[in-house]
A protein has these predicted regions:
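Sec-dependent N-terminal signal peptides
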Residues: 4-14
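Asparagine-centered strand-capping/turn motif at beta-strand->loop junctions
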Residues: 64-68
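Short edge-strand/loop segments of extracellular domains
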Residues: 78-84, 166-167
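Beta-strand signatures of extracellular beta-sandwich domains
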Residues: 73-77
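Extracellular/luminal beta-rich ligand-recognition
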Residues: 87-108
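Extracellular/periplasmic metallocenter environments
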Residues: 20-27, 46, 69-71, 103-112, ...
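Beta-strand secondary-structure signal
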Residues: 37-39, 61-63, 135-137, 147
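N-terminal edge beta-strand
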Residues: 30-60
């Protein structure tokens, strides 16, 4: 009986986590479909604004500026995707691609040939050095539980997360 309970619990939890990891969080948007522009400033370990209200089906252009003194990331994902991405970011630090206040783009390009994740060329994310600007155009296809976060090692853990409310 215990074994059956364990198997049922395992299958339930596994399907819940698997669904979260594979939930469609949206898709790369087209400039011609942009509903509105949201300007975002990244400071050292927080975003301004700290939350976003978005309607299902909206295509948003995020204009992101890093006003902090550290490298920061603006990444649209669910919690499981952030957890999966964090070891990739740690690997970038370990390989001296991602430094405290800069990104070694030559090393990044070289490493990306061996490991695509090291190129950090995700359509849902922008990684910026201090004083840099970038943008993401994202279509929010459905109401899912997502957040914007910085996955530079330690930043997510100290709360560099912005709530995304999709309705």
């Amino acid at each position: 009986m215990r074994l059956i309970k364990f198997i049922i619990l395992f299958l339930f939890l596994h399907s819940f986590v698997y669904a979260d990891m594979n939930m469609k969080i949206g898709s790369k948007g087209n400039e011609s479909e942009v509903s509105r522009v949201i300007k975002v400033v990244m400071y050292d370990n927080y975003y301004e604004p700290s939350s976003f209200k978005i309607k299902v089906g909206e295509t948003i252009k995020f204009e992101v500026e890093n006003a902090g003194m550290l490298v920061h990331e603006f990444n649209i994902a669910n919690k499981m995707m952030h957890k999966k991405h964090q070891p990739e970011m740690l690997k970038m630090v370990e390989n001296e691609i991602l430094l405290v206040d800069s990104i070694d783009k030559k090393k990044m390009k070289k490493m990306a040939k061996m490991d695509k994740a090291m190129g950090h060329s995700h359509s849902n994310s922008v990684l910026l050095e201090p004083k840099q600007k970038g943008e993401i155009i994202w279509k929010f296809d459905n109401a899912v539980n997502i957040e914007v976060a910085c996955n530079v090692p330690g930043h997510y853990q100290v709360g560099m997360i912005a709530k995304v409310d999709i309705n």
